[in-house]
């Protein structure tokens, strides 16, 4: 039985990793071992970053809504509770966009929430 040397496969894998490491500084773009470590770390960080982006945007939307509701003398949590009681089903992204681009409409939403809280 012939010995399998895997030269073709390892060359293909090395080229793939070095292609992904293109633009890295120094040996990280030229040496397979360090390039592989850098690529693995970069791919892991990009995966984590995609998950964190969702959290970051939600936090941003909440901060914007909170700022807009406090201008109208209401806290964020009470506003969200009032909106829920009123049966208005708008997500936080849309609420933050309304707060920025159409303050009058947002003030009307705050008034609806206040009425529901007092009722």
UniProtKB/Swiss-Prot annotation:
Keyword Protease: no
Pfam family, one: Ribosomal_L20
Gene3D superfamilies linked to this entry: 6.10.160.10, Ribosomal protein L20
GO biological process: ribosomal large subunit assembly; translation
Keyword tags: Ribonucleoprotein, Ribosomal protein, RNA-binding, rRNA-binding
One GO MF term attached to the UniProt entry: structural constituent of ribosome
GO cellular component: ribonucleoprotein complex; ribosome
Keyword Translocase assigned: no
NCBIfam families registered for this protein in UniProt: rplT_bact
Entry's family note: Belongs to the bacterial ribosomal protein bL20 family.
PANTHER family: 39S RIBOSOMAL PROTEIN L20
The protein's role, per its UniProt record: Binds directly to 23S ribosomal RNA and is necessary for the in vitro assembly process of the 50S ribosomal subunit. It is not involved in the protein synthesizing functions of that subunit.
Name of this protein: Large ribosomal subunit protein bL20
